[in-house]
């Protein structure tokens, strides 16, 4: 229970330091707040630094009906909230051979990293190179479609990671969230024809941050901006 003790202590200190207690809000209210995010808010969120750890061990527990996974590497302690299918993907207690993709929620300077989802199983074998290179198409307004390869290095990859990396790239290389360029979507097409879509006008839904897909079976990725 060491991880849980650390988590509670960190959370208590954070509340004392900021004087803020975060309460639950209903999903309808949360979605409304997300949809109201401005270009600058989205640009800020998808430009935040990320913390990535591979082949680590985490501790999963439930506290007051909520599911968490704790990971400590060196002096970096992270508490990850599991809100979607990931809460059933990992067992209570110790989970080894996992990868975590951490993007801090909020802008506090607390020592603990508070993140949502982004936990996946580590690769079953070690790869020398990338495991998959699906076609990446970038479509911006009425401009010609740009095509490239997108390099996948994980067998099990979270929508959170794909969403972040694709938007970060679009921000830096194609002007997403600048000069009114906020609408559009990301479409990830699998080998069997099924698709996963992400709305660029809002942050990825919290419940989907824990979803993961088979990186070896991604056939094509389309990023449409307008």
Swiss-Prot record:
Function: Mediates virulence by proteolytically cleaving host proteins, including collagens types I and IV as well as human cytokines IL8, IL17A, and IFN-gamma.
Location(s) in or outside the cell: Secreted
Lineage of producing organism: Bacteria, Bacillati, Bacillota, Bacilli, Bacillales
Origin superkingdom: Bacteria
SUPFAM superfamilies for this protein: Bacterial enterotoxins (SSF50203), Superantigen toxins, C-terminal domain (SSF54334)
Main enzyme class: hydrolase
Gene3D superfamilies to which the protein is assigned, alphabetical: 2.40.50.110, 3.10.20.120
Native organism: Staphylococcus aureus (strain NCTC 8325 / PS 47)
One record GO biological process: proteolysis
Alphabetical UniProt keywords: Hydrolase, Protease, Secreted, Signal, Virulence
Protein name: Staphylococcal superantigen-like 1
Enzyme nomenclature, EC number: 3.4.21.-
Assembly behavior: Homodimer.
Signal peptide start-end: 1-30
UniProt similarity note: Belongs to the staphylococcal/streptococcal toxin family.
Molecular function terms from GO: peptidase activity
Cellular component terms (Gene Ontology): extracellular region
């Amino acid at each position: 229970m060491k991880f849980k003790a650390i988590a509670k202590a960190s959370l208590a200190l954070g509340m004392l330091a900021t004087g803020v207690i975060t309460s639950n809000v209903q999903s309808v209210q949360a979605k409304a707040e997300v949809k109201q995010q401005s270009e600058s808010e989205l640009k800020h969120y998808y430009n935040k630094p990320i913390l990535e750890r591979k082949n680590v061990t985490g501790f999963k527990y439930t506290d007051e009906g909520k599911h968490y996974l704790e990971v400590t590497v060196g002096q970096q302690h992270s508490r990850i909230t599991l809100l979607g299918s990931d809460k059933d993907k990992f067992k209570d207690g110790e989970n080894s051979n996992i990868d975590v993709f951490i993007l801090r929620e909020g802008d506090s300077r607390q020592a603990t990293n508070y993140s949502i989802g982004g936990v996946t199983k580590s690769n079953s074998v070690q790869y020398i190179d990338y495991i998959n290179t699906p076609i990446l198409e970038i479509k911006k307004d009425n401009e010609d479609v740009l095509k490239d390869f997108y390099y996948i290095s994980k067998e099990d990859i979270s929508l959170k990671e794909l969403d972040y990396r694709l938007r970060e790239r679009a921000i830096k290389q194609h002007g997403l969230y600048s000069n009114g360029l906020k609408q559009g979507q990301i479409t990830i097409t699998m080998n069997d024809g099924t698709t996963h879509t992400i709305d660029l006008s809002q942050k990825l839904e919290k419940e989907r941050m824990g979803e993961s897909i088979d990186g070896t079976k991604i056939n094509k990725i389309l990023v449409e901006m307008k």
